[in-house]
Amino acid sequence: NSQPMRILYLRSPESRERLRPSLSATNLDKTMKAPLVALVAYDTQFWEHLPRMFHNPAAITWFKDKGAHTEITAFRNATLQGGYYLLALRAVGLDCGAMSGFDLAKADAAFFPDGRLKSNFLVNIGYGTGKGIVPRNPRLGFEETCRFL
């Protein structure tokens, strides 16, 4: 209900150049060449919008001036929103490569200098060719990651 996710679309070459210093070496080339890059961020003051979206007048007090609680909530809920965003992109036929391999502090300084928004992850968006896709790395099995009580 808090809807803290914000997306900054980096379309122009100039915006990509601003992002370049924050990219890891392994993500540099593919990000600079992607048709569109989404910088998925979260609003640390998302609570300001709660009166419009949440039918409990006290909701704003749950997060205003609550420090780490507000930050963790914004990050967690924006990450959940980001997962659904990826599903939506794929549902309309787009290929997307989500990545966390970048320097968040550098990206924040370049795009969100006032500190209200904070970077979460990047998504390269476009129509892939299938070239250069490496086999998926092994994954932990269900038995290793889940249990029932």
What are these model-predicted stretches?
Residues 2-5, 94, 120:
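Short secondary-structure junction motifs
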Residues 4-6, 52-56:
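Short Gly/aromatic-enriched secondary-structure transition segments
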Residues 22, 52-53, 110:
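Residue-level signal for well-ordered alpha-helical positions
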Residues 28-33, 37-40, 113-134:
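A glycine-rich helix N-cap at a beta->alpha junction
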Residues 38, 57-110:
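Small-aliphatic-rich amphipathic alpha-helix that forms the alpha element of a beta-alpha
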Residues 55-57, 118-149:
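C-terminal helix-cap and adjacent tail motif
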